[in-house]
Amino acid sequence: MIIWLAELLQPYLSFFRLFEYLSFRAILSVLTALGLSLWMGPIMIKRLQMLQIGQVVRNEGPESHFSKRGTPTMGGIMILAAISITILLWTDLSNPYVWAVLTVLLGYGAIGFVDDYRKVVRKNTDGLIARWKYFWQSLIAFVVAFALYAYGKDTAATQLVVPFFKDIMPQLGLMYIILTYFVIVGTSNAVNLTDGLDGLAIMPTVLVAAGFAVIAWATGNVNFSEYLHIPYLPHASELVVVCTAIVGAGLGFLWFNTYPAQVFMGDVGSLALGGALGTIAVLVRQELILVIMGGVFVMETLSVILQVGSYKLRGQRIFRMAPIHHHYELKGWPEPRVIVRFWIISMVLVLIGLATLKVR
């Protein structure tokens, strides 16, 4: 929005030429989203407390979690508001990639909102019925996948980029739609599973978004994309501003979500942020690097799959409790230790993911 206004005012005030620079808008994006989150945080927490919208805690969970019962949840609303406002302010709204991310972010946020509402307001511990949750997630993912495929059919936008290999970029064809579906839905649910401790999900989300900001910048730059042997996608550069909006909003939320948390993001935040990260990975053609950079999310998801599979096949559990962060809690690790160590793992994995761009 601002970029259009700046174009109109450039002939009169040269200052507005600054808004043409991606780096300038990326910095403003971080600061705007951070400021909005910090401003909305106390208001949101107070409002949620007044409405008695508090966290539901499972009785079979770690005893240390019982004290969290009643902590305001659905704080993801302020994350989505900060990201959305920032994107509308600082991105080029004629860019289709921006709208693809916004569609998934707000669509999955709506699904998470209904799920949270049923849990904490209607006191239905199951929330939104699983099959309906997956139906709406799938519908949104397929709509976005079909739209992106139609827009970039048989171009670099539908190639598969394989880490460590500079000459292996097969054209996916219709498989692009299937891959896009699984990446968006899978990442959304993976972040949702990770969101079980104070700040555990939001910091890896911030780190992965920061990593994708670098990748989006390189992908949208003709010289660097050629140098790194990755597809050149001119629309991808605008995703830098989207990623930095996620970084800023996430850091602002972490201010209130750090241990001991004053507010939780709820499904409205985790499903939306995961879906947005998956969409960004698809748009910059780095789905496989997402598996590396988002390794904490992958680890949490695999722990659940292995736990359920082992119990059904052998009648035995592999972990004391899944997702795996609860396993370490039950082993006696203090919650802050689990959180910070997972953050460190996430930071290392993001750096490894970025390194793969050069190691080819």
Curated annotation (Swiss-Prot):
InterPro entries per record: Glycosyl_transferase_4, PNAcMuramoyl-5peptid_Trfase, PNAcMuramoyl-5peptid_Trfase_CS
TM ranges: 26-46, 70-90, 94-114, 132-152, 168-188, 199-219, 236-256, 263-283, 288-308, 338-358
Official protein name in the record: Phospho-N-acetylmuramoyl-pentapeptide-transferase
UniProt KW Cell cycle keyword: yes
Pathway note: Cell wall biogenesis; peptidoglycan biosynthesis
Enzyme class label: transferase
Physiological role: Catalyzes the initial step of the lipid cycle reactions in the biosynthesis of the cell wall peptidoglycan: transfers peptidoglycan precursor phospho-MurNAc-pentapeptide from UDP-MurNAc-pentapeptide onto the lipid carrier undecaprenyl phosphate, yielding undecaprenyl-pyrophosphoryl-MurNAc-pentapeptide, known as lipid I.
Keywords: Cell cycle, Cell division, Cell inner membrane, Cell membrane, Cell shape, Cell wall biogenesis/degradation, Magnesium, Membrane, Metal-binding, Peptidoglycan synthesis, Transferase, Transmembrane, Transmembrane helix
Record EC number: 2.7.8.13
Gene giving rise to this polypeptide: mraY
Organism listed in the record: Vibrio campbellii (strain ATCC BAA-1116)
Subcellular location: Cell inner membrane
Biological-process GO terms, alphabetical: cell division; cell wall organization; peptidoglycan biosynthetic process; regulation of cell shape
Broad class of the protein's primary localization: membrane
Cofactor: Mg(2+)
HAMAP family linked: MraY
GO molecular function ontology, one term from the record: metal ion binding
UniProt topology in membrane: Multi-pass membrane protein
Reaction(s) catalysed by this chain's protein: UDP-N-acetyl-alpha-D-muramoyl-L-alanyl-gamma-D-glutamyl-meso-2,6-diaminopimeloyl-D-alanyl-D-alanine + di-trans,octa-cis-undecaprenyl phosphate = di-trans,octa-cis-undecaprenyl diphospho-N-acetyl-alpha-D-muramoyl-L-alanyl-D-glutamyl-meso-2,6-diaminopimeloyl-D-alanyl-D-alanine + UMP
One GO term describing the cellular component: plasma membrane
Keyword Cell inner membrane: yes
